[in-house]
């Protein structure tokens, strides 16, 4: 369950933030049980509709979530550095999420401006923190603990994503018979 996303300088996202929690109980909601099982104060939006006109970032949001979930499967950082919009500036990605355990995780990635021809592992600082979700906790309570670093740190291998997988049509074929914008010199 994705709870919160903050992005800066990745793809075209600049100082972007979306939160998918409910601080207060919604009365007469048409969607039932928008909370964690046995954690009724930990509320989240089960349905999120991303709308917008052409070229407003809807597909790019999906691609960003794909990068994140695939990172949790293999720990490859280059998938992020290849999507930094302005290499002269720092880039940041922060995602709060819950798996099938009663833990709130925070993925934090900070990438400094590119100092060499390509990014190295030292340029990319990725940390994953977590805090237990206690019976009476809300998302806001747990996020506050993460903000104050009253939490534990872990690695991507130890996050139980229970097989999260995300693919995109461009990834489905090894024999590509089409070209992408990135490969066409008439596009910047």
Where are these regions (language model features)?
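Pre-Walker A-like glycine/lysine-rich segment at the N-terminus of P-loop NTPase domains
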Residues: 4-66
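A short, sequence-level motif marking secondary-structure junctions
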Residues: 20-25, 110-116
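Exposed beta-strand and adjacent loop surfaces of beta-rich binding modules
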Residues: 2, 15, 90-92
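Conserved P-loop NTP-binding catalytic core
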Residues: 43, 53, 63-115
């Amino acid at each position: 369950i994705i709870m919160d996303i903050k992005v800066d300088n990745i793809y075209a996202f600049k100082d972007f933030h979306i939160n998918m929690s409910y601080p207060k109980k919604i009365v007469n909601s048409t969607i039932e049980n928008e909370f964690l099982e046995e954690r009724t104060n930990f509320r989240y939006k089960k349905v999120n509709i991303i709308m917008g006109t052409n070229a407003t970032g809807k597909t790019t949001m999906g691609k960003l979530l794909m990068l994140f979930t695939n990172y949790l499967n293999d720990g490859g950082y280059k998938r992020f550095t290849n999507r930094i919009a302005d290499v002269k500036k720092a880039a940041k990605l922060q995602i709060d999420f819950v798996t099938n355990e009663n833990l709130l995780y925070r993925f934090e990635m900070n990438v400094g401006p590119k100092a060499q021809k390509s990014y190295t592992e030292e340029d990319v600082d990725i940390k994953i923190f977590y805090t237990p979700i206690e019976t009476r906790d809300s998302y806001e309570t747990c996020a506050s603990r993460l903000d104050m670093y009253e939490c534990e740190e872990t690695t991507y291998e130890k996050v139980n994503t229970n097989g999260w997988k995300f693919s995109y049509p461009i990834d489905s074929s090894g024999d590509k018979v089409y070209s992408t914008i990135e490969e066409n010199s008439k596009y910047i």
